[in-house]
Structures are given as structure tokens and as C-alpha cells.
């Protein structure tokens, strides 16, 4: 069994991006600029956004953080998004989720300029991804693809089972694993909470990608020997014996599943670190496309 070390691969990617930024600086060009909007003071969201800011500093990006109160109106948030859409200095930006109940999340995500949508959540980018066109791939699925590629895990002709159908992970993964190329060319089964006899499905899978937010959902008896297991889940489970009062658990019963798997991602340290690095990679791509448009406009 091989651990898919997302932390190591994530650091490798950051080093590669930092190298590209050095080249950009040597050419006297503007470095990539990533911005984030965060609404309220949700602890997990704050931690995630702060990790993005630190990652930007490490690779040499500019970063901007816009904090809005929990009471912000939908119109005020949309105005801030439009402001960032029109700011030529910003190459890409994200709106940190979740948003408070007075705000329509889909309406907000739809308001982001697709050319700056480095989270890859805009319908334009999702549609382009489904059609194998140039787009921004959502950061978590992008990170999973990168792990599969860097560990040279075969996907062609394999049966991939995706558990969970969110637009952030499950649905894009089902599209990406079935597309032409590598990683891809899999036969994909997309499952969810209404799938009957799910063990019958998972036990036939060569690759399982799970993102349901239920700790230890995938058990050892639910997989076949030598399956590849990608665990996207991350849940804080109360634990009186833990220093922080909780432990982090994934969707996979790691102790038992790892005994049968050929490759497996740990939680933490697997998919999580990859998400931030791929957000940076999307921002670098956004900057390159932005720069090309600016150069072409001067011709």
C-alpha cells in the first residue's frame, strides 16, 4: 500500500509555481494577484482563507483579502464582486463558502467573471470543462487529477466510482475521470445517498473517490483488493482526549481500508493540501490568459 502524499506533492507544485513567478519578475511583468472575499467569521473558512494568503506569500503572488460582515446584503456582496471583476490588477478571485442564509450562493457564484473564476464554479467554466474546452477546473478535483498523474496511477479502462454528487467535487470528478486523456478514460459510476446496495457498486471499483462528509463511511469490506482510494472528506469529530477537543477524520475507515488498498490518501495530508496549490495554479493560468489578452489588445 502506497500513501498518496498530498502534502509533499503540494509543496512540489508550490516550488514550481514560485519558479514561474521568478521568471515573470525577470521579464519585468506583473506577478499573479489572487483575491478572496470572506463573509462573516466562520472559523473553518477563516483558517482556509488564511492558508491561501500564506500560500500566495510563499510563491510570490500578490494577495488581497476582503472581509465583509455576516449581515452583508446580497446586493452589497454583488457590488463587491463587480468591483473585483472590473479591477485589472486582480487576475483571479474566490468567494469563500459557505455564505449566510440571506444570500443566494448560486447567484453570487454566477456573478464572478468566468475569466477570474479560479475556483471553477461558474456555469461557463463547468460547461467548458464538460466539453473538454479550456476552462478552470475546480481546485479539489484538479488536485485529485494531479495526484493520480504524479503517482502515475492508471485510469484508462478502469472502473471509477465517485461517492457524492456535489458541484464542488463529485459531479466534476465524474466528468473528468470519463474524459479523453490521462487521467481519464475511465468507466464512471456516480453514486449518492439514494444509491441502493452501494457496497455492490464499490466492491467492483478500481478507483474510489469519496466526498460525502460522513466519517468512516467507506469500510474495508466495501472495497476490492488493490483499489485506489481518494478520500476528500474532512470532518471535526469531538474527542475529549484530543488536545483541541476534536480529531480530523475523513470519509474512509483508514485503518481497515488501507489494509486492502494499493494507493490511499490520508486525512489530513492527502487531498486537502492539493486544493490550495491547485487554486494557485489556476491563478497562474488566469494571469497568463489575462496577460495574453492585454498583449493581443495592443496589436
Curated annotation (Swiss-Prot):
Record field: catalytic activity: (6R)-5,10-methylene-5,6,7,8-tetrahydrofolate + NADP(+) = (6R)-5,10-methenyltetrahydrofolate + NADPH; (6R)-5,10-methenyltetrahydrofolate + H2O = (6R)-10-formyltetrahydrofolate + H(+)
Name listed for the protein in its UniProt record: Bifunctional protein FolD
Function description: Catalyzes the oxidation of 5,10-methylenetetrahydrofolate to 5,10-methenyltetrahydrofolate and then the hydrolysis of 5,10-methenyltetrahydrofolate to 10-formyltetrahydrofolate.
Lineage, broadest ranks: Bacteria, Pseudomonadati, Bacteroidota, Flavobacteriia, Flavobacteriales
GO cellular component: cytosol
Keyword Transferase on entry: no
InterPro entries: Aminoacid_DH-like_N_sf, NAD(P)-bd_dom_sf, THF_DH/CycHdrlase, THF_DH/CycHdrlase_cat_dom, THF_DH/CycHdrlase_CS, THF_DH/CycHdrlase_NAD-bd_dom
Assembly behavior: Homodimer.
Pfam families according to UniProt: THF_DHG_CYH, THF_DHG_CYH_C
The protein's Enzyme Commission number: 1.5.1.5, 3.5.4.9
Signal peptide: none
Keywords: Amino-acid biosynthesis, Histidine biosynthesis, Hydrolase, Methionine biosynthesis, Multifunctional enzyme, NADP, One-carbon metabolism, Oxidoreductase, Purine biosynthesis
Entry similarity comment: Belongs to the tetrahydrofolate dehydrogenase/cyclohydrolase family.
Gene behind the chain: folD
GO biological process, one term: purine nucleotide biosynthetic process
Superkingdom of this protein's organism: Bacteria
GO molecular function terms attached to this record: methenyltetrahydrofolate cyclohydrolase activity; methylenetetrahydrofolate dehydrogenase (NADP+) activity
Biological pathway: One-carbon metabolism; tetrahydrofolate interconversion
Keyword Glycosyltransferase annotated: no
Residues engaged in binding NADP(+): 164-166, 234
PANTHER family with a match to the protein in the record: C-1-TETRAHYDROFOLATE SYNTHASE, CYTOPLASMIC, C-1-TETRAHYDROFOLATE SYNTHASE, CYTOPLASMIC-RELATED
Species annotation: Christiangramia forsetii (strain DSM 17595 / CGMCC 1.15422 / KT0803)
Amino acid at each position: 500500500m502506497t500513501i498518496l502524499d498530498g502534502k509533499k506533492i503540494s509543496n512540489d507544485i508550490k516550488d514550481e509555481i514560485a519558479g514561474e513567478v521568478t521568471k515573470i519578475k525577470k521579464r519585468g511583468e506583473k506577478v499573479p494577484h489572487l483575491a478572496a472575499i470572506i463573509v462573516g467569521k466562520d472559523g473553518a473558512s477563516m483558517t482556509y482563507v488564511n492558508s491561501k494568503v500564506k500560500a500566495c506569500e510563499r510563491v510570490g503572488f500578490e494577495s488581497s483579502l476582503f472581509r465583509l460582515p455576516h449581515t452583508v446584503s446580497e446586493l452589497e456582496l454583488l457590488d463587491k464582486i463587480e468591483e473585483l471583476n472590473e479591477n485589472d490588477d486582480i487576475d483571479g478571485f474566490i468567494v469563500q463558502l459557505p455564505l449566510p442564509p440571506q444570500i443566494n450562493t448560486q447567484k453570487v457564484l454566477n456573478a464572478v467573471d468566468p475569466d477570474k473564476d479560479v475556483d471553477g464554479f461558474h456555469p461557463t467554466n463547468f460547461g467548458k470543462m464538460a466539453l473538454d474546452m479550456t476552462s478552470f477546473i475546480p481546485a479539489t478535483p484538479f488536485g485529485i487529477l494531479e495526484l493520480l498523474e504524479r503517482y502515475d496511477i492508471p485510469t484508462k479502462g478502469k472502473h471509477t466510482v465517485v461517492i457524492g454528487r456535489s458541484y464542488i467535487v463529485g459531479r466534476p470528478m465524474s466528468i473528468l475521470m470519463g474524459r479523453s486523456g490521462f487521467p481519464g478514460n475511465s468507466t464512471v459510476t456516480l453514486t449518492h445517498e439514494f444509491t441502493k446496495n452501494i457496497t455492490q457498486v464499490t466492491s467492483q471499483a478500481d478507483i474510489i473517490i469519496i466526498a460525502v462528509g460522513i466519517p468512516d463511511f467507506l469500510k474495508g469490506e466495501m472495497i476490492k483488493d488493490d483499489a485506489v482510494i481518494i478520500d476528500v472528506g474532512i470532518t471535526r469529530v469531538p474527542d475529549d482526549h484530543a488536545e483541541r477537543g476534536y480529531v480530523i477524520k475523513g470519509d474512509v475507515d483508514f485503518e481497515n481500508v488501507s489494509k486492502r488498498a494499493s494507493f490511499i490518501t490520508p486525512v489530513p495530508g492527502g487531498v486537502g493540501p492539493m486544493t490550495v496549490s491547485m487554486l494557485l495554479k489556476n491563478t497562474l493560468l488566469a494571469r497568463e490568459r489575462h496577460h495574453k489578452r492585454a498583449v493581443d489588445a495592443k496589436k
